[in-house]
Structure formats: C-alpha cells, structure tokens
Amino acid sequence: MVMFKKIKSFEVVFNDPEKVYGSGEKVAGRVIVEVCEVTRVKAVRILACGVAKVLWMQGSQQCKQTLDYLRYEDTLLLEEQPTAGENEMVIMRPGNKYEYKFGFELPQGPLGTSFKGKYGCVDYWVKAFLDRPSQPTQEAKKNFEVMDLVDVNTPDLMAPVSAKKEKKVSCMFIPDGRVSVSARIDRKGFCEGDDISIHADFENTCSRIVVPKAAIVARHTYLANGQTKVFTQKLSSVRGNHIISGTCASWRGKSLRVQKIRPSILGCNILKVEYSLLIYVSVPGSKKVILDLPLVIGSRSGLSSRTSSMASRTSSEMSWIDLNIPDTPEAPPCYMDIIPEDHRLESPTTPLLDDVDDSQDSPIFMYAPEFQFMPPPTYTEVDPCVLNNNNNNNNVQ
C-alpha cells in the first residue's frame, strides 16, 4: 500500500495581490511549498489561463461556448536548486520554505474584463502543479483581475444623447389623451462615481396621474450555438413628483449616480455587458412610456468629465432639493452575489421597472373623496317591539 505524503502548504502568491492588470502588463508572483517530512519533488509547473465562457440549458440542449484570451505554461526552478543527483529531483525538508518565482506578460490588444454573471464569466487564473514520484499531482489555483481599458473621453462618448416619445392612452377603447416624454444627457460615457445629469420634459394630457422615473439598467447578453440569452438587472433609480392631468413637468439636471459596477464589455464575441439609462413614465392601467438612452461605463475618467459631473450634481441638488425623492439605492452587481433576487429578470424591460408602491401612489384617475355613509345599527335577534308590548301588558295588569 502506497502512503501519500502530506504537504504542509502549497500556494500561489502574487507580488501585488490587489492589482488589476491591463493588456501588456506583467503578472509576477511565486509558488510557495512547505513539507511535513522529507519529500522528493520532480517538478513544479504553472499554467496561466484567461478564458471567457458561457453555458446555459435551452430545453434539453446545452448551449456552451468558450473563448481563450491567455494561455501560458512554464516549469519553475529554485534559485539555488538542491538536487538528488542524476534524476535532478529536489529534496525538500521540513522547516524550510521553498519559493519558485514566475512571471509572464498579458497579450497586447483587447482583453475581456474579469466578470461573473448568471450564464457566463471571464476568468483569469494561475494554477500550480507539484509533481512527485509515486504520488498524485497536487494543485493550487489563484485568480487575478484583468480590466480592459474603456476610455470615456473619446469624441463619440462625449457627445450628447437625446430621444423623445409619445404614447396615446385609451380607456375601454375610448381615447384618453396622451403622455409624452423627451430627454437628453450631456454625454454617453461615464465611470463609477460619476453623476448623470438628466434634462427631461414630461406632458400629461390623459385623465390619470402619472409618475416620471429614471433607472440605470444592465443587460448581459450571452451567445452560444447560434442562441442568445439576455439577462437584465435594474441597478439604481430616481423618481420625480406626480404629474396630474393636463399639466407638464421638467427635470433640469436631475442627478442619478453611477454606482460601483463593472465597465462595459463590448468586444467579446460570446459575452456582452451593456448599460442603458431608462427614462420612463408610469401610466396606471397602461404600458409605460420608455426612453432608452445607451450608456458606456468606462475604466478611465478624465478631469473634464469629472468636473462637469460635479457641477451638474451641485446644480441638481440646489434645484431639486424639495422635489427629488429618490428610491433607496440598491446594491450593484458582482454581480450575482449581491443583486436582490427580485431584480434578476430574464423577462422584458417593462416588468423590471414595475414598483411595488405604484398601486398606492398612482391612482388611475383623478377623483373626489368618496362619501362615507353612516354604518347600520347593531344587529340583534330580539325584536324590540315585542319587548315593548310585553312591558306594556305587565304595566296594565
């Protein structure tokens, strides 16, 4: 019977554990080995990988696809490697710490940003292998983060984005006016911590009370075997005051902050992470009027964008101090562990934007308070007329 020798510790350690790497940068670290007893080691190897993969079930069919970004293999040596003669094995003894250094460069060009979603991920890791004669190979694995640069200061992403939409409202096939919304944001590209300054105009000519709102929404698109899977998350939102029938409302620099989220992933062929600013009007008893303004979340923010963001935030706070009633901000994605389950939807966008309190603060029609009648008298099974007749008879007798 072969007795397996235990290893006290076997781990991969990076020189800068907190660093987020970019294309062309060097990843360096060491593999640390400690033993409990004298051990002969044939080799210490590493394998570095970066891969995007998607996987989900479409009925009985498995949709699966992978895309490699990185693959690097090497056999490591000690700086002063003690050997056991001809076979060149390393003799490791208890009480000593053996360190094998490694280093490699990430490929130049676009790399997928590290990401973990419901149906796919982009992972980068280093795996170490400890080969011993007559013993099973021992493995140790360590992940590291990679972020592909997305510069939001390009002319395309600094250009304003605008849209407008109008919807006819009806009740029992009878026309009931219109609801219209037009909106504009100063630019398309933002970074974590930036404030989106929203300029919008709303008009309500229907008989219902409507509520204007805005939300940042993430869309994760997975592609495999010719099939597409879309997963939507509502990240943060803000709302305005009710708009009664026959009136208008405007937002002039209403602010919505970009929470802690991953940059957009647009260059991957099997996995995309896209963001949108949805400006919409909740119309009770009818579909929402929704404007979809595309956003690009970047990894680099310039001074000009940050300055304009702060300026818009200040003006918005001064102008809307009495009117801005924001929703409680929700946790941003890492995605799968911190997004509430009720905001993880694979259905269309409209159910995603439904709010629990719509039925309470958005009556369908404007109406006068209902008249309350007096309650009926207390019911009794004893006829008071019979009691009165009996009392009168007793008095006569």
From Swiss-Prot:
Q: Which UniProt keywords apply?
A: Cell cycle, Cytoplasm, Disulfide bond, Isopeptide bond, Phosphoprotein, Transcription, Transcription regulation, Tumor suppressor, Ubl conjugation
The free-text tissue note of the record is: Ubiquitously expressed.
> How would you summarize the oligomeric state and partners of this protein?
Homodimer; disulfide-linked. Interacts with TXN/thioredoxin through its redox-active site. Interacts with transcriptional repressors ZBTB16, ZBTB32 and HDAC1. Interacts with DDIT4.
- Keyword Ligase listed: no
Functional description taken from the UniProt entry: May act as an oxidative stress mediator by inhibiting thioredoxin activity or by limiting its bioavailability. Interacts with COPS5 and restores COPS5-induced suppression of CDKN1B stability, blocking the COPS5-mediated translocation of CDKN1B from the nucleus to the cytoplasm. Functions as a transcriptional repressor, possibly by acting as a bridge molecule between transcription factors and corepressor complexes, and over-expression will induce G0/G1 cell cycle arrest. Required for the maturation of natural killer cells. Acts as a suppressor of tumor cell growth.
Task: Enumerate the Pfam families for this protein.
Answer: Arrestin_C, Arrestin_N
Q: Which family does it belong to?
A: Belongs to the arrestin family.
Where, per UniProt, does this protein localize?
A: Cytoplasm
| Top-level taxon in the UniProt lineage | Eukaryota
Report the protein name in the record.
Thioredoxin-interacting protein
Residues modified to Phosphoserine: S362
Q: Which InterPro entries does this entry report, sorted A to Z?
A: Arrestin-like_C, Arrestin-like_N, Arrestin_C-like, Arrestin_domain-protein, Ig_E-set
Disruption-associated phenotype: Marked reduction in the numbers of natural killer cells, low levels of Il2rb expression in the precursor hematopoietic stem cells and severe lymphoid hyperplasia in the small intestine.
Q: Which GO terms describe its molecular function?
A: enzyme inhibitor activity; ubiquitin protein ligase binding
> Where exactly is the Glycyl lysine isopeptide (Lys-Gly) (interchain with G-Cter in ubiquitin) cross-link placed along the chain?
K213
Naturally occurring in which organism (per UniProt):
Mus musculus
